[in-house]
Design a protein with these regions (language model features):
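Bacterial N-terminal signal peptides that target proteins for export
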Residues: 2-20, 28
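Sec/Tat signal peptide C-region and signal peptidase I cleavage site
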Residues: 28-34
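N-terminal (or domain-start) structured segment
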Residues: 35-104
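Bilobed "Venus flytrap"/periplasmic-binding protein-like clamshell domains
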Residues: 38-64, 70, 126, 130-197, ...
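Pocket-lining segment of extracytoplasmic ligand-binding domains
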Residues: 99-101, 110-111, 140, 176-270, ...
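A structural signal for short loop-to-beta-strand junctions that line the ligand-binding cleft
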Residues: 113-127, 132, 252-261
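Ligand-binding clefts/hinges and TM-proximal coupling segments of bilobed small-molecule sensing domains
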Residues: 151-168, 242-304, 308-311
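An extracytoplasmic/periplasmic, membrane-proximal ligand-sensing/linker region
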Residues: 190, 197, 207-225, 235-238, ...
Length: 332
């Protein structure tokens, strides 16, 4: 039986849309380098952890770009599915992707069944755990997922890993979006205000914790986290290698003194086999040789371990550039 991952954060996150400005500042111009090369990282919404991850990686790459000639930029996108498709099209070099979305893309399953296998998808390293988190209006008195029947529920924006995972959970329950009276498609930076304004009763969100997009509604209107458990969840976790049970700590968010049980994936950093070995090697080196700095750039990264990042949650083969660095450092 798989173990339950514990998220080990002991403090709350006071962060909002200002995160975008913070990471823009981190990407300030540096001296031009000869034979400069550009790499782009697909992330997610500007208030989410994926954007923070991309910003942290680019910050460390750009720090030494006068030496290696690579300039890194972050793209705010619709999320995991969009990132995979755009990497496949050659329009992005790298991206942050849920491990389940990466698995389906590489194997041509799930939402990628019609498109077929993306056999050039390559893993770079994994990041933080992402529990699927159900957040509801306090007044709605929702105690379990079953209580959401007939409610107004945000299922995630199209192209996001959250949306793909929501649809998989519903299918496993023998349900579809008609289970809700309204299935809204708001972005993560919109769902908190919609909840507090009474426009929706809850939302589903796969995210690293603590998250500003959950901190805001739990602070502003006492929003409640709801555990996501039961036989269907147990079967999903046992069936799919990219899932694990996850516990969100008691008191991580205001007005939520209880531990919240759920399941989830890992965020992973991916690329294409078409991206040069030297480029990926340089990006990996920038992160792993400034690892303590990287961990400080967002609370979700605080308990990352190098040894876990080279093996856990990787849904596609390692890119040769990443593999070369990891072998040099004895991590493989």
């Amino acid at each position: 039986m798989k173990k339950t991952l514990k998220i080990k954060f002991g403090k709350q996150l006071a962060m909002s849309a200002g995160a975008a400005a913070m990471f823009a500042a981190l990407l300030s111009p540096l001296p031009a380098a000869a034979q400069q090369k550009f790499v782009s990282i697909g992330t997610g919404g500007v208030t989410g952890v994926y954007y923070a991850a991309g910003g942290a990686i680019c910050r460390l790459v750009n720090k030494d770009r006068a030496d290696h000639g690579i300039r890194c930029s972050v793209e705010s996108t619709g999320g995991s599915v969009f990132n995979v498709n755009t990497i496949k099209a050659g329009e992005l070099d790298l991206g942050v992707v849920q491990s389940d979305v990466g698995f389906n893309a590489y194997n041509g399953e799930g939402q990628f069944k019609d498109a077929g296998k993306f056999d050039k998808l390559r893993s770079v390293f994994s990041l933080h755990p992402e529990p699927f988190t159900v957040v509801t209006r306090k007044e709605a008195n929702i105690k379990s997922f079953d209580d959401l029947k007939g409610k107004r529920f945000n299922v995630g924006n199209p192209g996001s890993g959250t949306r793909a995972s929501m649809e998989q959970l519903l299918a496993a329950q023998g349900r579809d979006l008609s289970f809700f009276s309204l299935a809204s498609e708001l972005r993560p930076d919109e769902h908190g205000s919609a909840l507090c304004d009474g426009k929706i009763d809850g939302f589903f969100y796969g995210v690293g914790h603590p998250s500003a997009n959950i901190q805001d509604p739990t602070t502003s209107c006492g929003a409640q986290l709801v555990s996501l458990t039961g036989p269907v969840v147990d079967k999903l976790v046992e069936t799919y290698p990219y899932y694990a049970k996850v516990a969100i700590p008691a008191g991580l968010y205001p007005n939520n003194p209880q531990e919240t049980e759920s399941y989830g994936v890992l965020a992973t950093f991916v690329t294409s086999a078409d991206v040069p070995e030297e480029t990926v090697y340089t990006v990996v080196k920038a992160v792993f040789e400034n690892f303590e700095d990287f961990k400080k750039l967002h609370p979700a990264f605080g308990h990352l371990e190098k040894e876990d990042m080279v093996k856990n949650g990787l849904s596609a083969p390692l890119h040769p550039g990443a593999e070369k660095y990891f072998k040099e450092k004895g991590l493989l």
